[in-house]
C-alpha cells in the first residue's frame, strides 16, 4: 500500500497542500521577496492581454451609469437598509477608503486597481460594512460589465453620492484598471494584530519610535486603519493630540492643512457612524467569515444586526441636522456648541454638546419620531483644538463658497492622486483646469525629429566628449524616478534639470550639471539648424543620449544594435513642479547605481526589489539591468563596486561570468557593506562588491537568472534583454505610447 492510499485508509487528507504548512517566506523571512515583481500577470487576469479598458470605457454611456447610481442612492434594501433612506454617506465612505490608502512615500495604495475588493483591505477594521456597499453596487457593475472597472465605479459612486445630496463636485476621470489579486508589494506595517496600540508594551512591532515618529512609508496610525483613530491616539480622547496624528497622516497622503480641514469637514457633513451595541456582537471579517456568507463579513448578532442595530466603528455619531444634504451645519455645530466627552452605546469615546444643547435638532436614521443632539468625534474636535486647523475651519465657516470649492478640489485630489498625469484621464467629466499635483508637462507644440535627425544627433552626442558612463547614468537618473504605483516620475518633463531632483546626492549634482550643459548646447545648436519649427526637447535628448551610449558600448562588445527611441517628451518648468511633492521620489537607496547608505546595507536587497517593483520590472529585467549598468560604469560616484570587468564601458556579460566564477572567494571588507573578491589561489583582491551585487550569486532564484546571462552563449541574449529592459524604463511614463 502506498503512502497516499494509506492516508485515505486512515481518513487523512492525502493532499498535503490542502493543509497549512510553512512557506519559504516563513522559513527565511530575511530573503528579498521576488514575488512582488510578478504580480498581476496575464495568468491572473481573466480579461486577457488584448483587453483595452480605455477603449471600453470610452464606449460607456456614462450618463446612464450616473442615472442608475442616483436611483440606487434611495433604493433601500432590507438586508442593509439605507441610513436616512439614502446610501450617500455609505458610498462616500467607500470611495474615500478606496482612495485614502494612498501614501506619497512610495505611491502605493489608492483607488487604482480596486484593491478594496481584496485582502487585507477588504477585512480591515476601518472598512467594516464596506463589503455591503460593494455588494449594493454589484447589479450596476453587472449591468455595465467590462465597460467600467470596479476601481472606477467605486470612485464614480462617491461622486454621484455627493451630487445626489446637493454638492457640486470638481470632476471625475476614468481610467483605473482593475487588478485581480491582492497587492503584495504594499507594506502596511509589522504589527501582528489589528489595531495594535503604539503604547502597548506587548506590541513588539510598533510603527512609532521616539517622539511619536511614524515609520515610513506608512500613513496610518494603527494596523487596519485608513488614517487616524477617531477616538484619538490609541483611543485617548485628546483632540490636540489627535490633530498631530491627523496632520502627519494626511500630509503623507499629500494633503496640506487646508485640504485636510476641507476633507474632514466636507465628508462629515453627510451620514453617520454606527455603534449600536458592543463590538463582541460582531462576527469575523470577510476573509475569515464562513463560506455561506459569500464574502460578506462582520455579521452582527446585536438585534437585527442592520439598520438601527448596525455596528461598524462602534461610534454612534450624527454630525449635522441635514445628513443627506450639503450644508455648512458641520462647521456651525463644531463652533456653535461647547462639547463634553461621552460614550457611544458600544462604549467608544465621542462628544456631545454641553448642558443638553442641540437636543432634538438632528434626525434619527430610521425612526422619524426620534430626534437627537448632534455629536462629534475626537478627530472632529481636533479641527477646533489645533490653532492652525481652527483658523482654517473658521474661515470656511464664514465663507461657505470657499469651503465648498476647497472640499470639491480636495475630494478630486483624494480620489485621483494615484492616477498620475492627465494623459491617463478618461471621460467627459475631466476638469479642464491643470493642477500642480498632476505633475503637468507642456503639450507637444512642434514637429518631432525624424529618423535622419536622430542619426545626426547621435553623432553629435558621441563626439561631444561625454563618456558612456556619464550619458547612461544621466538617462537612468532622469527616467528611473518613475513609480508604477502612482504613475509619477519618469523622464518626461526633464525634471532632472529642476529642483529637487537636480540636487539629489544620488544624481551627483556637479557631474549632472556638466552633462546637462553639454546636452543643452547640442540641443540649442540642433534646434537652431532645423526648419519648419521642428525641435527636440531636452527630455528627449537625455534619453536619446543614453541610448546612443548603449549602442556604442554594444558595438565595442562586437554587437550591432539599435536602442528604440520615441520622441514626444517635453520640458516642464520649475513653476510646474511642486518641490515638496517631488521630494518623496528621491530613493533612500538605489541599488541599480550601487548607491546604498551604510545604515541601509543590511536591507539593500529588499530596497532593490522594492525599487524594481515600482519600476514595474520583472526579476529577469532587474537582473539584466544590474549586470549591464555595472559594466557600463553607471555607479554613483564612479564606484568600482560590482564592476566585474576589465573593460568598463563595454556592454558585456562580464558581471555575470565573473560573479559566478568559483575561482573567487568573497569576504567582508573593512568598509561596512562592502565585500572583497579574492583569487582563491593567489589571495589577491580581484573585485569589490556590495550586498546588492552579491545578492545575484547568493539568492537562489537570482543566481538562476544570473546563470542564464553568465553562460558562454549568452552575450547576444544579454544585450538584447538589456536593451529591452532599458527601453521599458526609459518609456515607463510615456502613456501616449500605450
Curated annotation (Swiss-Prot):
* Family annotation (InterPro entries): Catalase_peroxidase, Haem_peroxidase, Haem_peroxidase_sf, Peroxidases_AS, Peroxidases_heam-ligand_BS
Positions that bind heme b = 268
| E.C. designation(s) | 1.11.1.21
GO terms of biological process kind: cellular response to hydrogen peroxide; hydrogen peroxide catabolic process
Q: Where is this region: Disordered?
A: 352-371
What SUPFAM superfamilies does the database record attribute to this sequence?
Answer: Heme-dependent peroxidases (SSF48113)
Q: Which cofactor does it need?
A: heme b
Q: Where are the active-site residues found? A: 97 (proton acceptor)
**Function text:** Bifunctional enzyme with both catalase and broad-spectrum peroxidase activity.
Q: What's the family? A: Belongs to the peroxidase family. Peroxidase/catalase subfamily.
- What is the name listed in the Swiss-Prot or TrEMBL entry for this protein? Catalase-peroxidase
Amino acid at each position: 500500500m502506498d503512502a497516499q492510499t494509506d492516508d485515505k485508509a486512515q481518513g487523512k487528507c492525502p493532499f498535503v497542500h490542502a493543509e497549512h504548512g510553512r512557506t519559504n517566506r516563513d522559513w527565511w523571512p530575511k530573503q528579498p521577496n521576488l514575488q512582488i515583481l510578478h504580480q498581476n500577470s496575464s495568468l491572473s487576469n481573466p480579461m486577457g492581454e488584448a483587453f483595452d479598458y480605455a477603449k471600453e470605457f470610452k464606449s460607456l454611456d456614462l450618463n446612464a451609469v450616473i442615472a442608475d447610481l442616483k436611483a440606487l442612492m434611495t433604493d433601500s434594501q432590507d438586508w442593509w437598509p439605507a441610513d436616512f433612506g439614502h446610501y450617500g454617506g455609505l458610498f462616500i465612505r467607500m470611495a474615500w477608503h478606496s482612495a485614502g490608502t494612498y501614501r506619497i512615500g512610495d505611491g502605493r495604495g489608492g483607488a487604482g486597481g480596486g484593491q478594496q475588493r481584496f485582502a487585507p483591505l477588504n477585512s480591515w477594521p476601518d472598512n467594516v460594512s464596506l463589503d455591503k456597499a460593494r455588494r449594493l453596487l454589484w447589479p450596476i457593475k453587472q449591468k455595465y460589465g467590462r465597460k467600467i472597472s470596479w476601481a472606477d465605479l467605486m470612485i464614480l459612486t462617491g461622486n454621484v453620492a455627493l451630487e445626489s445630496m446637493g454638492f457640486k463636485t470638481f470632476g471625475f476621470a476614468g481610467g483605473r484598471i482593475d487588478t485581480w489579486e491582492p497587492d503584495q508589494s504594499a507594506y502596511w506595517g509589522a504589527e501582528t494584530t489589528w489595531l495594535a496600540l503604539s503604547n502597548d508594551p506587548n506590541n513588539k512591532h510598533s510603527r512609532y519610535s521616539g517622539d511619536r515618529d511614524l515609520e515610513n512609508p506608512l500613513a496610518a496610525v494603527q494596523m487596519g486603519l485608513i488614517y487616524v483613530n477617531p477616538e484619538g491616539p490609541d483611543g485617548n480622547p485628546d483632540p490636540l493630540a489627535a490633530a498631530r496624528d491627523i496632520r502627519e497622516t494626511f500630509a503623507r497622503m499629500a494633503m496640506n492643512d487646508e485640504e485636510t480641514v476641507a476633507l474632514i469637514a466636507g465628508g462629515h457633513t453627510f451620514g453617520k457612524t454606527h455603534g449600536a451595541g458592543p463590538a463582541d456582537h460582531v462576527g469575523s471579517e470577510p476573509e475569515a467569515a464562513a463560506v455561506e456568507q459569500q464574502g460578506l463579513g462582520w455579521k452582527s448578532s446585536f438585534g437585527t444586526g442592520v439598520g438601527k442595530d448596525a455596528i461598524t466603528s462602534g461610534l454612534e455619531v450624527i454630525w449635522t441636522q441635514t445628513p443627506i444634504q450639503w450644508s455648512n451645519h458641520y462647521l456651525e455645530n463644531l463652533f456653535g456648541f461647547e462639547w463634553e466627552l461621552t460614550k457611544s452605546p458600544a462604549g467608544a469615546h465621542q462628544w456631545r454638546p454641553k448642558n443638553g444643547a442641540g437636543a432634538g435638532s438632528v434626525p434619527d436614521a430610521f425612526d422619524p419620531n426620534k430626534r437627537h443632539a448632534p455629536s462629534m468625534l475626537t478627530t472632529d474636535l481636533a479641527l477646533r483644538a489645533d490653532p492652525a486647523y481652527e483658523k482654517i475651519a473658521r474661515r470656511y465657516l464664514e465663507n461657505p463658497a470657499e469651503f465648498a470649492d476647497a472640499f470639491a478640489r480636495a475630494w478630486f485630489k483624494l480620489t485621483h492622486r494615484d492616477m498620475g498625469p492627465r494623459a491617463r484621464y478618461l471621460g467627459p467629466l475631466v476638469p479642464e483646469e491643470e493642477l500642480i499635483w498632476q505633475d503637468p508637462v507642456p503639450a507637444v507644440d512642434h514637429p518631432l525629429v525624424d529618423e535622419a535627425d536622430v542619426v545626426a544627433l547621435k553623432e553629435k552626442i558621441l563626439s561631444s566628449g561625454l563618456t558612456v558612463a556619464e550619458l547612461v547614468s544621466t538617462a537612468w537618473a532622469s527616467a528611473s524616478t518613475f513609480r508604477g504605483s502612482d504613475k509619477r516620475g519618469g523622464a518626461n518633463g526633464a525634471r532632472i534639470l529642476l529642483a529637487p531632483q537636480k540636487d539629489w546626492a544620488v544624481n551627483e549634482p556637479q557631474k549632472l550639471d556638466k552633462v546637462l550643459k553639454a546636452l543643452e548646447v547640442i540641443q540649442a545648436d540642433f534646434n537652431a539648424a532645423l526648419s519648419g519649427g521642428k525641435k527636440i526637447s531636452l527630455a528627449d535628448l537625455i534619453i536619446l543620449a543614453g541610448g546612443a551610449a548603449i549602442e556604442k558600448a554594444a558595438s565595442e562588445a562586437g554587437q550591432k544594435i539599435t536602442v528604440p527611441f520615441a520622441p514626444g517628451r517635453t520640458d516642464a518648468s520649475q513653476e510646474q513642479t511642486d518641490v515638496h511633492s517631488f521630494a518623496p521620489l528621491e530613493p533612500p537607496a538605489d541599488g541599480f547605481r550601487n548607491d546604498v547608505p551604510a545604515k541601509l546595507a543590511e536591507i539593500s536587497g529588499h530596497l532593490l526589489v522594492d525599487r524594481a517593483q515600482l519600476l514595474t520590472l520583472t526579476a529577469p529585467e532587474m537582473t539584466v539591468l544590474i549586470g549591464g549598468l555595472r559594466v557600463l560604469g553607471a555607479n554613483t560616484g564612479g564606484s568600482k563596486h560590482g564592476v566585474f570587468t576589465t573593460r568598463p564601458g563595454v556592454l558585456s556579460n562580464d558581471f555575470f561570468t565573473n560573479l559566478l566564477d568559483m575561482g573567487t572567494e568573497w569576504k567582508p571588507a573593512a568598509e561596512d557593506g562592502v565585500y572583497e573578491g579574492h583569487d582563491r589561489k593567489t589571495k589577491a583582491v580581484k573585485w569589490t562588491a556590495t550586498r546588492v551585487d552579491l545578492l545575484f550569486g547568493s539568492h537562489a532564484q537570482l543566481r538562476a537568472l544570473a546563470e542564464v546571462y553568465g553562460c558562454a552563449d549568452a552575450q547576444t541574449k544579454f544585450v538584447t534583454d538589456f536593451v529591452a529592459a532599458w527601453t521599458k524604463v526609459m518609456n515607463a511614463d510615456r502613456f501616449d505610447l500605450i
